[in-house]
């Protein structure tokens, strides 16, 4: 994960890294900390310390890290981040998550309306959209389109694919599952 993330970033094959002005990292492992240090040679990096336990002290530390990150972003972009903007961003992201969850729900049907790889292409593709407010509507429209095509896929074993990250390499896993008679449902 670390090696491929770093490689994609420094070779400009990762659109997230390519289009970013700053990388926000976290301290989940020593390998990632080193990766962020090396990425700092290419772009500004801010690393957030994650608390090791869920405690009052850990929550205090996490709140301080969030505030520090906000201050770094405000200075870098010369823009004061208001509480109103944060609330709005939360609403936008929650609407996107809700629409994606609703889209995934169609894969619960006895007769599936689409292949898992098609579903993955839809949702993965939307991660590259810069108009975050439009995403929920796009997902809803895609869901309606899929359901209107009236496909009835049956007789396949349903497979749930999880992990971190669910990125480009996941496509190969889904293809393997579906080329061997299964179907990735989420």
Where are these regions (language model features)?
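Trp/Phe/Arg-rich N-terminal binding region typifying the photolyase-homology
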Residues: 1-83
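A charged, amphipathic alpha-helical module
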Residues: 67, 71-186
